[in-house]
């Protein structure tokens, strides 16, 4: 029987972590271990440990990194597969893990990631964006798909993603330093090695963000900076085409839904994303004061 562990980085956890742990509690497949890498012990509450047995490792904020922190968790796991999750992801039903792990019966599958959905509180644009990025159809991706899918071939999200430990180790593990995109960098590596990345649409979590225009700018600045930092990977493909298709499809959806009044918001937010991304790709040429003003993850750029 396949063994699996869960790795959850946390920072100032609250009710959302309780919801996640309760969601794990009702799963038909239960993890062997739950490793929580918590940033700053003073923000941790012992009540989190009453829902399920968890292994908690506390780190300083200055030591947190999207790659290195998950790498630490992966090194703690001795299971066949480990699943990375974020503290604000919530299982949609009791079959999240059983559905997410089912592709690993194929030994060529290295990674499987879950579908992200919204709840009734989400706005129309965010809901459609999640449906665009996480459709109701499975997808098996290999290096052959890079020609037709571009950067989307490497798309993967550690909001909820499972990794075959043996292939992960063979690929060298997560990068130790990155503002984010450790998941896509790993997907690119395993595809280059000849393995598959699977999107499982029936493995579902509730996860979304209603970002302001400024937050969209800052998040995409970090995205651009990540693409610049690992240009040897990301320069192989273009991301502009995919972004343009999202804007076009969202606008058409809003018109068909009779919500044309949201189109100005879509335009302004999309412009903020594009400008942020382009500036992020030049982060190493900008004054540090501007980088710290533009970025979302300020500790990373200090």
Q: Predicted regions: what is each one?
A:
Residues 13-26:
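Short, well-formed alpha-helical segments that are part of the catalytic scaffolds
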Residues 143-163, 179:
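A recurrent flexible, glycine/aromatic-enriched loop bordering the glycosyltransferase active site
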Residues 90, 94-127:
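Conserved donor NDP-sugar-binding/catalytic core segment of glycosyltransferases
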Residues 21, 32-41, 57-59:
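Short beta-strand/loop segment that forms part of the nucleotide-sugar
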Residues 222-225, 229, 236-302:
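Non-catalytic, C-terminal membrane-associated alpha-helical segments of glycosyltransferases
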Residues 82:
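Short aromatic/hydrophobic "clamp" motif used to bind/position activated sugar donors
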Residues 60-77:
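Glycine-rich, basic loop-to-helix element that forms the pyrophosphate-binding segment
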Residues 180-186:
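Acidic donor-binding loop at a coil-to-helix junction in glycosyltransferase catalytic cores
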